[in-house]
């Protein structure tokens, strides 16, 4: 169904172009005509170009009016065809876009062929108008391309800013989690140190068989001092008397 509609639209457009319904508009450059009329110095030579320029202006005006009416009729017919095609194919967006692109390319080719055929018979004013039209179309295309590039650059910058914001929002959470974990680890280390100090004192006192009053022999004191110096947990209780006093104060007198 889509192919049939496309073929029918192409056939109608080709018939319209073959009949000469679509032709470019002719714009008369009055400034060029006045300069061309003022150039010759002889009155006879000036009269001949002026009459020819007036005839060319009249013919160009009549051709412009007829071509504008024909182009408006052809545009109305093409619009009606495109509207009927879009109504019949409301669900097929791709076919409509294909038909639009094909109609645009065919219209550009037909306009170029008709402009080439008319440029051979028209004057320099039509050529200047065609060049101005082509320059305006190129400027419009360049403006559209620049707008599209600016929109794409703005989208990329917004996406980059979003990613930067997300990374910035992620970094404080990671730093806070790392700080909380380090604080919990330090607290557990301190608790472990306290436990190690207490257990070490009790084990050493039991192994050395301290006296009931808590007094130790010089040999036992020396051995305890050496052990505490090697152990990192005995940083504040390097003295053996301090270890024994802490044990006695916490656990009471030594039971053995």
From Swiss-Prot:
The modification 4-carboxyglutamate is found at residues 222, 226, 229, 236. Disulfide bonds join 228-234. Gamma-carboxyglutamate residues are formed by vitamin K dependent carboxylation by GGCX. These residues are essential for the binding of calcium. Transmembrane segments: none annotated. Coiled coil: none annotated. One of its GO terms (molecular function) is structural constituent of bone. Residues 38-193 are annotated as: Disordered. Its main location: secreted. It is found in: Secreted. This is Osteocalcin 2. It comes from Diplodus sargus. The gene is bglap2.
